[in-house]
Every structure is written in structure tokens, then in C-alpha cells.
Amino acid sequence: MTTSIFTLTPGKITLSDLRDFYFGQMDVRLDDGTFEALQRAAESVERIVGRGEPVYGVNTGFGKLAKTRIPDDRLRDLQRNLVLSHAAGIGQPMPERVVRLILLLKANGLARGYSGVRPQIVQLLLDMLNQGVVPVIPEKGSVGASGDLAPLAHMSAVVIGEGEAFYQGKRLKGDEALKAAGLEPLVLGAKEGLALLNGTQASTALAIAALLDAERLFHAALITGGLTLDAARGTDAPFDPRLHELRGQKGQIECAAVYRALMQGSAIRASHLEDDERVQDPYCLRCQPQVMGACLDNLRQAARVLVIEANAVSDNPIHFPDTDEMISGGNFHAEPVAIAADLMAIAVSEVGAIAERRLALLVDAQMSGLPPFLVQDSGLNSGFMIAQVTAAALASENKTLAHPASVDSLPTSANQEDHVSMATFAARRVGDIVDNVRTIIAVEYLAAVQGLDFLAPLETSAPLLEVAKTLRKTVPFFAQDRLFTPDMEAARALIIDGALGSCVGSGVALPALEG
């Protein structure tokens, strides 16, 4: 994969930038004008410390210990102790792509110049990112206020040569990983440990990763919905633009246009335009634009919130270098991320729910008109029977996972931090839902293409035919029972890679999250 260069202008990251970074291979360079501003901010912190006034997290303890004054000669120890004590996460390491996003977002937030850190701090974060030093960040342990303390402490531990990091496939001690990459750890100055730990970058990175994966998944679900509609010999009449314009919901209008484009020129559709005794299709076919459009609108709302948060200063206290002020606030509270993640969880779960119903229709011979469970010699062969059960199990699991996390606060830090967002779990579980729905869509993909094969020599539309042919390159027709999981994994891989969206061509305008 070719590595490209991305110049980071603090506070100016777009969704397109995040998409390119997440799915591509990019080295990040800091805009040249940023270094001087960061140096001025660090000098301002020195002046504030020199005045001797108590400033939270600079010369005081943290959380409930904020009233404890720290002597000037112990300020570096204070920052180091903060990092070490707060590195209390647990669980499996976060995925590398998520950790890379965390490094990018933390560098972006600090580089805006309102956290009082030296330019060397931001540069080391970017050097770690570019050299492939990936901190080991346990997935559990943050409540999303005061920021993502435990995850970011594990990231920051590597900055000071502690903790662990992956480097070139090996899990090493933090100092060893830095040394192997030709980097050196830093000694943190006043405010710098707190600036590294405070912030919403872990929950935001998890949410953005889930969002970008969900975008590809959403496109795949639109396409498999079209495949199923044609395999079940459904009608495209409910996609008439006049219906959707009258309702006025933007996502619904766009999704209806996608279905019209997907069905254009289908010989299967043409074969039952007349003398079809069915008056209306079931909701899972007929109401696809309404359901998918609502999901699209909410994914877009989440995207707007998350791009803002990706560029946010979510530190505390926030430093205003022009006036040498430190103002304590609550920008670390990740409620916007938590609610955005909850919206995503509901939307993606619904994408899977309606897809599972389409799949159930396909395997039901009375509903679809296709062979029972989409296999010849049914009875001797069980065909897609249990694959549909797997999809149903995952759709049901998603109903529990989609329960809002943001409404489930618990007080922490001796009731000083008495309302928290649960944003990190909120975002992390969206990734679980996305993965479940990938499998549901994968089984629908397999089933719909199997159904189309039974309708030969009639062919579906040109774009849908390309999607079917892509599957058949790796998964043959299901002529008799065989191990099913390998077929599911092959279909999942195509969905993860975005292959379905690439197949349909420019004639089908798949909706982007920027809409």
C-alpha cells in the first residue's frame, strides 16, 4: 500500500481526511506554523507557574484531591505520577487502526495551542504514529468523563517510556518500542501529563472507526436489499420518486433513488410487470427507503457531531496563552460522543434488523417462490436454514447492544465526578453491532445471489449482476450442503473491503455521510 503525506492543520480535519486516514496508509506532518504557537503557549504556562497561584492539575492534585497544593520542585513528578496511576485499563488491546486515530486526534487537539504543551509533545505523538509505534491501550476502563483517562494514560505511558507498545508485530515495553523506532521518551513538564490524559480522543476514535465501517456496511446493505428484491421478484413501484418527495425526508429520497438505479434494466423485474397477482410486497422489501433513509439521516447526524469533536479542545483546564489564563471547565465530558454513538447503535442495528427479515423472506418458499431454504433436494439438504438462524441470533443480540449507554451514568472520584457519559463503551459497542450486521448482510448476500441463480436464464440489472458475479468468483452455487461458515467469511470480506460499492459503478450514486 502506498503511503501518502497528510499535513495536519490543527482544528481543520474533515470527514474525508478521517476516511482516507482510517482506510489508507498516511504519514502525518504538522503544519509549519503550529510549532511557534505551541512554544508560545508553553512559555505562557511557565509564567503562570511562576506567579505561584494554584492552578488545577498544574500545581494541585487531581479530581477529589484538587485542593492539595504541590511544591514547584515536584511538578514533573506530579505529571509522571498522573500518567502511571491512571493507566488502569483492562481488557484486550484496542485495534491498531483505532489507536492510530487516537494518536491523530490527540495531536490535533493539543496542536490547537490551548493545552499548554511544548511542540515536542505533539511531534512525538506524530512520530509514534508515522513510525508504527502503537501503544497498547486496553479497551475497557473509561466512563467518558473526565475524558478518557485510562485509555489516554496508556497512550501517554509510552510517551514517557513506560507501558507497552506494538512495533513491527512485536509487543514491547514502551521504552524498547521507542528505541527500536529511533525515538526517545520525554520528561513531562507542568500541565503536560494532564493535557495528554484529559480529552475525548479515545471514545471519539472508537466512534469514528465504527462510523466509517458502518458507512461501507450501509452501502452493502442497500445493494443486498436490491439483490433480495429482485430475487424475490418484488416490485420497484414503491421507489417512485413522487412518493418520497411528498414525505420530504432527505435520506429516504436518496435511498429510493439508489434502489431505482439498482433495479434499472432488470429482466427479472420486466418478467412480472404484468399479470402479477401480488398487490404489495412485505414491508422488508417495500419500506426499504423509509427504514434505510432514517438510518442514513442519523448516521449523518452522528458524523457531524464526531467531526466537530475530532477537532475539539477537550482538555481541562483550558489554557489561553494570550492572556496567561487557565480556566477550569467541562469540555472533557464526552456526552456529545455518547449520544452520537447511541444514535449510530440504533441506526446500524436497524440496518441489520430489516436485512434479517429480507433473508427470512428469501428462505421461505411460500414468501419468495424460490426452493425451500434456497437449495435443491430440500429435506435431504438443509441449505440456508441455519445460516438464517445465525442472522436472527445476531439481530436479536443487537437489540440489547443498542440500548442507550449515555443514560447510564455512575458517579466516580468520591462523587466529585458525579455524572459521566459512558461514551467509550457507547462507541466500542457500536463496533460490535457493525460486526454483527456484517454477518447478517453477508448471509443475505449469499442468499440473494443463490436466489437469482434459480431464476436463470433471466438476469438481474447490470449493476446487481456485477455484484453477483463478484461473489461467485469466490463462492460457488450452493448445490448441496457443505460447510457454511467459509462462505459467510468470504462474503464478509467483500463487505469489509467495500467491494460491493465498487461493483455497482458510477450509475448508482451511493449516499455519503457528508450529505
Swiss-Prot record:
Pathway: Amino-acid degradation; L-histidine degradation into L-glutamate; N-formimidoyl-L-glutamate from L-histidine: step 1/3. There is a cross-link at residues 145-147 (5-imidazolinone (Ala-Gly)). One of its GO terms (cellular component) is cytoplasm. The keyword Transport does not apply. It holds the Pfam family Lyase_aromatic. It catalyses: L-histidine = trans-urocanate + NH4(+). The keyword Kinase does not apply. Contains an active site 4-methylidene-imidazol-5-one (MIO), which is formed autocatalytically by cyclization and dehydration of residues Ala-Ser-Gly. The modification 2,3-didehydroalanine (Ser) is found at residue 146. Its EC number is 4.3.1.3. Gene3D superfamilies: Fumarase/aspartase (Central domain) (1.20.200.10), Fumarase/aspartase (N-terminal domain) (1.10.275.10). It is an enzyme of class 4 (lyase). Belongs to the PAL/histidase family. PANTHER family: HISTIDINE AMMONIA-LYASE. This is Histidine ammonia-lyase. The lineage of its organism: Bacteria, Pseudomonadati, Pseudomonadota, Alphaproteobacteria, Acetobacterales.
